[in-house]
């Protein structure tokens, strides 16, 4: 698997992957993204800002995620715990797969580990599959943050712990 930054012409394929992921989430009882998240405008913004990344192989694109460097506003306040450290970090958002390839999450996280010593990510309490992937890849549960007034389980990976 390889990773590259998305370009505007990738938008249709990216939105297709998000549609597949939303359907899977709903089928597995996870309401986190509903029927319309993430909206196309947000993905266009991620592409323009260089945050949107694609995971692909010789058969095509199988995954997408957004990677942000710097302070994540929703992580400024954490309840029921604390972050592992206050050092600079990158944040992974909106990771999704087309379901046709294995190891999408691990591939994305390994890429991120090559960029930063600290990675933060969050997920919905109903997203049991993502919780398992996050924990399997060495992240520690740190507490609860809020996204659009909805609680999320917050995790951090640091190469110092």
Name what the model sees in each region.
Residues 2-16:
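A short beta-loop-alpha structural element at the N-terminal edge
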Residues 97-114, 131-136:
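Conserved acetyl-CoA-binding loop-helix of GNAT-fold acetyltransferases
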């Amino acid at each position: 698997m390889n990773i590259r930054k998305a370009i505007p012409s990738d938008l249709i394929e990216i939105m297709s992957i998000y549609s597949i992921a939303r359907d899977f989430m709903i089928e597995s009882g996870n309401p986190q993204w509903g029927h319309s998240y993430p909206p196309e405008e947000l993905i266009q913004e991620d592409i323009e800002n260089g945050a949107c990344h694609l995971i692909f192989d010789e058969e095509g694109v199988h995954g997408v995620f957004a990677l942000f460097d710097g302070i994540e506003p929703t992580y400024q306040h954490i309840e029921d715990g604390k972050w592992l450290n206050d050092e600079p970090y990158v944040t992974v958002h909106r990771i999704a797969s087309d379901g046709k390839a294995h190891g999408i999450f691990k591939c994305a996280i390994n890429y991120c580990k090559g960029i930063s010593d600290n990675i933060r990510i969050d997920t919905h309490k109903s997203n049991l599959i993502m919780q398992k992937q996050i924990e399997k890849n060495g992240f520690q549960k740190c507490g609860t943050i809020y996204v659009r007034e909805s609680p999320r389980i917050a995790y951090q990976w640091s190469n110092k712990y």
